Amino acid sequence: MPEIYGPQPLKPLNTVMRHGFEEQYQSDQLLQSLANDFIFYFDDKRHKTNGNPIPEEDKQRDVNRYYQPITDWKIMKDRQKTVSAALLLCLNLGVDPPDVMKTHPCARVEAWVDPLNFQDSKKAIEQIGKNLQAQYETLSLRTRYKQSLDPCVEDVKRFCNSLRRTSKEDRILFHYNGHGVPKPTKSGEIWVFNRGYTQYIPVSLYDLQTWLGAPCIFVYDCNSAENILINFQKFVQKRIKDDEEGNHDVAAPSPTSAYQDCFQLASCTSDELLLMSPELPADLFSCCLTCPIEISIRIFLMQSPLKDSKYKIFFENSTSNQPFGDSKNSFKSKIPNVNIPGMLSDRRTPLGELNWIFTAITDTIAWTSLPRPLFKKLFRHDLMIAALFRNFLLAKRIMPWYNCHPVSDPELPDSITTHPMWKSWDLAMDEVLTKIVIDLKNAPPATALESQMILQQQETLQNGGSSKSNAQDTKAGSIQTQSRFAVANLSTMSLVNNPALQSRKSISLQSSQQQLQQQQQQQQQFTGFFEQNLTAFELWLKYASNVRHPPEQLPIVLQVLLSQVHRIRALVLLSRFLDLGPWAVYLSLSIGIFPYVLKLLQSPAPELKPILVFIWARIMSIDYKNTQSELIKEKGYMYFVTVLVPDWGVNGMSATNGSAMINSGNPLTMTASQNINGPSSRYYERQQGNRTSNLGHNNLPFYHSNDTTDEQKAMAVFVLASFVRNFPLGQKNCFSLELVNKLCFYIDNSEIPLLRQWCVILLGLLFADNPLNRFVCMNTGAVEILLKSLKDPVPEVRTASIFALKHFISGFQDAEVILRLQQEFEEQYQQLHSQLQHLQNQSHLQQQQSQQQQQHLEQQQMKIEKQIRHCQVMQNQLEVIDLRKLKRQEIGNLISILPLINDGSSLVRKELVVYFSHIVSRYSNFFIVVVFNDLLEEIKLLEKSDINTRNTSDKYSVSQGSIFYTVWKSLLILAEDPFLENKELSKQVIDYILLELSAHKELGGPFAVMEKFLLKRSSKAHQTGKFGFNSSQVQFVKSSLRSFSPNERVDNNAFKKEQQQHDPKISHPMRTSLAKLFQSLGFSESNSDSDTQSSNTSMKSHTSKKGPSGLYLLNGNNNIYPTAETPRFRKHTEPLQLPLNSSFLDYSREYFQEPQMKKQEADEPGSVEYNARLWRRNRNETIIQETQGEKKLSIYGNWSKKLISLNNKSQPKLMKFAQFEDQLITADDRSTITVFDWEKGKTLSKFSNGTPFGTKVTDLKLINEDDSALLLTGSSDGVIKIYRDYQDVDTFKIVSAWRGLTDMLLTPRSTGLLTEWLQIRGSLLTTGDVKVIRVWDAHTETVEVDIPAKTSSLITSLTADQLAGNIFVAGFADGSLRVYDRRLDPRDSMIRRWRAGNDKQGVWINNVHLQRGGYRELVSGATNGVVELWDIRSEDPVESFVDQNVTSQYGSQQKPTTMTCMQVHEHAPIIATGTKQIKIWTTSGDLLNSFKNSHNNGVTSTLAATGIPKSLSYSSTSDAFLSSMAFHPHRMMIAATNSHDSIVNIYKCEDERIDYF
């Protein structure tokens, strides 16, 4: 037997897909994309930030430690230098001081010289002085060293005074060795000799300060050295106190403040004596400071547990060839005899590599142990200070083993002694010594390489003044004198070209055999230190970088940049580190990375370009001001120009620069001939292979390619834009026709929006404040390219175009600028011409020069000739500049920009307001006249009682029709922009014009009279109870904007008082009067958005200042609830000033501060956002699967079971169920949005849409429902707003807002704005009481197409195919339906027209809906109750039925009722109609359920304010019509509400069948 569902068997349901849409389900590609592709809209950064940069306050708070700014990272060029050094040696060899009892044997070696090897003590101390000076010269050769050997007091005074006179204000090094005199006194006095060396004479520390002046660095190598340090500080404090009391020491050569900039290094504390171990030097402290590698090796071997086994070979011959004395002494067997081959300055040798490693390790220890300011002060300001303190760290580690504890001022922490990096230093020494042991045991007695190294050492050691007898003494200690630049060339300040290094490097390149040997040595690594630390750094980047703590390997990575072997790998890792955010960039800059990457810009190696461009983009993104002047030097900016224009200056410059770089000898340069297929290149390829494919725009390519991607070009353009920003010298050097043409090419042809955006910005910056560059760009067509980019599909590019064209606005000083440029180019031409003549003369005189020199001269000439031609071209351009032509172009630009006031992106419109502010500022006098005439015309209209009877022959003002009048009207439109920030900015521009008008000499008086007249008229209208907005005002507003708010809402007393404290428009009396003036004209000074922005937490109601008392309740409660906050927007509180400052450039450069090499947080597996998104996706799939079985239930179930009733507090006009959240969203006629949780029965949020009085919300849609949904509202004034986090009133924000329709007609029968959102295509269909259906593209935020409706009837309903998005259907007030296909030409897009409602007159379409799922039924419902199902392939309905129109009994008459609403379930074959009952139908026309939506709750709450008695209220509403209904998209649920009722009832279909078996 057939199954019975109702009172009779149901008609068969449709089982065929309608409209031929079955083809969509047969497309595997489409179904796969629907299942896997989740495209989210209005989710870009501009929607979350409103196009504003992060406020400085947030950066200072830095809650997430993302910035950690270090603003003083740059090492200034005028930093202090140690220019002179005093080496004061008080040894008195052969005589021990009386206060110290020395052991026997005891330490006696000074500066690696044993005095017992000399018969004459004078020669011994001279040799000690020479050696000590040579050791210091390894730290800094540029310092002038002077020795004072066993001096008397007079010599010391004369010596110190002379040094201060020659040093002026620079630093002096004072090294004091007091091994031959008593230890310093408790008061800090040091001892010297009298002239006869018969007495020890104390020298007051205060006198020493006076003689030496300041600043100084003091090294005390003596017993109880801390006594000097402590008393030095006391004397400095005494000088400061004396200065404060007015007793300045006039004998002091330096200001007292300079003494605070002194540094001190002392060998031991005040109660300690220096070590006396005979196996160690007596001046162990000085050895640690001046030759750390040698002393480290010796002490490492002496303390090694392997000295009797592995390292025994170093102790076997310790009794022979030792620098100190008699071989019979037993302690000599404890002293190792080791000679590390190589040179300190040559990092390719074992000794050089050890020195290099030591520099990296000590830098790391200091950087991780010291506060950042102290680290910078000690290690990044002075070469000598950095070297001494770096080596002092070694002293702090070694000397405590021998009961000496070095101290310093400033004091360094004791944690340095046990820092973990010292183990790395021990490991590095062990690796080198192990290889030496292997070579000594296995290698022949003397290899060719060793012989060459020995020869190099001997050549370096040879001095004219050294005797043959002393060669043996200095052999083991000769490491210290092998290179005078050892430590200096490894410091971060040593990147200048060193002549000695250059000469040695040029000699080494003379023969091809030596070059081959050099390359072989270059690849050889004696330790794995750097490679291991790079691996450690890579692991830190992979696993620990999210903690945002400084990695200890960063200083080591800095040192690795000096190595050509590991340079590319180090740069890649460094770029990955910089990609972590601004905090990483600041850290890198503070450690000293900048000089290195600046020097690398001179490298011609093509494989470095992508990495360097990326690194420089990161640096410029956080601090471009401190880098601009540096890029001028050596034309570093040209590196980025050649990335964009690879063939720039090929004939003239590249050959010259290339040869210069190859021969420069700088350790940071990399020649193009380098083997790029070496291990580093292969490593990077492995890195590329392991990296995921979607890393962002800044992926680094394989470096064997010379080409750069558009993303990398965008970074180069950004660097140039930052270089020329507010930097005229940079603009002058960077501007060239080649660059301009290439930028235009990229704007026209690149598919990467980022490149187009920054090319547009750079073009604008290149001609900013420069009429010559503007004229050149105009003549070359660059301006036309910018105008074309105003229609770019990407909002950021459109905004950039407005930003660039803003700089084309002429300045007041253009004529003076042209005159100055003429003078500059004339001077430049004369200089270049003289240089060219000099080169030509030089070429004629030197006929016998080499071919290379001849080529070099020719290249120089070609370069200068090219510069001369460029100079002549610019001079010619200056002569033909036509300022009037520039003005015409400027007006043309303005005309082209004006249509953007209707752009869908608030970012574009905000920049447009800024552009208008520049126009107003430049032509303020014109705008004063325009506004005055406009107000005058308005007063004339107000004087006419009937606008229709006014004299039509009245002439319009001369300002009407001008471009400035159009801009004024545009500003009025933008003053009512739906986006709050744009609105406030526009008001500032309008206020500025009115303030200028009020202060005008001639028009200020008449304007004041006009103001009084309007205010008086407004007050009279208020007293008579007339609403202050008449037809003449409508006429005034109509030409600019139809939806100006007619009322001015003010706050209650408490809120008004708060506003007066914060709002300058209220606190300024002139601005207050101007506000009243606008109120008198019917303009609202602020609409609901701005009124409630600051009162969201209190939710205080706003009342109307204007309007009669009868409208008070209606007007006052219009926006009682809070409005959404605008991201990163704060109201203007500063004095009004034009032009407005654009934040777009700072906002855009934040892109290069954000991580680009890794996935976004939401796409990273395991992240909170990823897990939340995955959970939502699984939940959505679960809901869809669970509700599939409910389709059958919808046919036989009971729909009249009420699930819950929700009180909206006002009558809901619109309702919308969320697909997957348990949310029901309602909107009433006062634009109040309410979000309910229907499962829990509570209100989640309640807020105002912020629409002006007289308008209401007419549509609700949800966007991105597959994830975190956004709420879209459409209001009757054509405004569309999109909200994020709408379910939480504390965090919800407005994402975007714009006018979907600009010519809406507000009539009593108008349905307002109707929308249809197509998630699959990102399209928003908008229509209403207009003659078009406008299609907005969410990707581009522009109008995609306007499709004519082909009728003058009002559109009442709109629906579209949600799967493909090509077909949409509109229902009209004349009862017709029209089908459109957007794939066709707009003129031919209407493909079908139907007449619904049985073709009766006076019937209009309530609703038309195309199912999202099911069999895609297209259902229409008319007001006469006719429900029809359509197939777009058919001209007639495929099914039709009529709601029986339940009649109402009034006496003996029966009147038919009207079907007020109709809804279709998205997936089930169910239709609901609403009259005074809810009826549930099948799509075949069978009635399943019929029930009333009646209740007793909520009625009186709605009508109590009207004063209607409760009995009458109930009787009038118990039989009320349904106001609105809404099906749940998936569940079998329906929400319904009655007219004049605040209660929303939700019904759920339930299975009530009884199973008897």
Swiss-Prot record:
One of its GO terms (cellular component) is fungal-type vacuole membrane. WD repeats lie at residues 1207-1248, 1252-1293, 1296-1346, 1350-1390, 1400-1440, 1452-1492, 1517-1557. It is a peripheral membrane protein. HEAT repeats lie at residues 548-586, 588-625, 777-814, 888-925. Residues 1084-1114 are annotated as: Disordered. GO terms for biological process: cellular response to amino acid stimulus; cellular response to starvation; positive regulation of cell growth; regulation of autophagy; regulation of cell cycle; regulation of cell growth; response to nutrient; TOR signaling. The keyword Cell membrane applies. Signal peptide: none annotated. GO terms for molecular function: protein-macromolecule adaptor activity; ubiquitin binding. PROSITE patterns: WD_REPEATS_1, WD_REPEATS_2, WD_REPEATS_REGION. PANTHER family: REGULATORY-ASSOCIATED PROTEIN OF MTOR (PTHR12848:SF16). Component of TORC1, which regulates multiple cellular processes to control cell growth in response to environmental signals. Nutrient limitation and environmental stress signals cause inactivation of TORC1. Active TORC1 positively controls ribosome biogenesis via control of rRNA, ribosomal protein and tRNA gene expression, and rRNA processing. TORC1 positively controls protein biosynthesis by regulation of mRNA stability, translation initiation factor activity, and high-affinity amino acid permeases that serve to provide amino acids for use by the translation machinery. Belongs to the WD repeat RAPTOR family. The target of rapamycin complex 1 (TORC1) is composed of at least KOG1, LST8, TCO89 and either TOR1 (TORC1-A) or TOR2 (TORC1-B). Interacts with PIB2; following activation of PIB2 by glutamine or cysteine. TORC1 binds to and is inhibited by FKBP-rapamycin. This is Target of rapamycin complex 1 subunit KOG1. It comes from Saccharomyces cerevisiae (strain ATCC 204508 / S288c) (Baker's yeast).
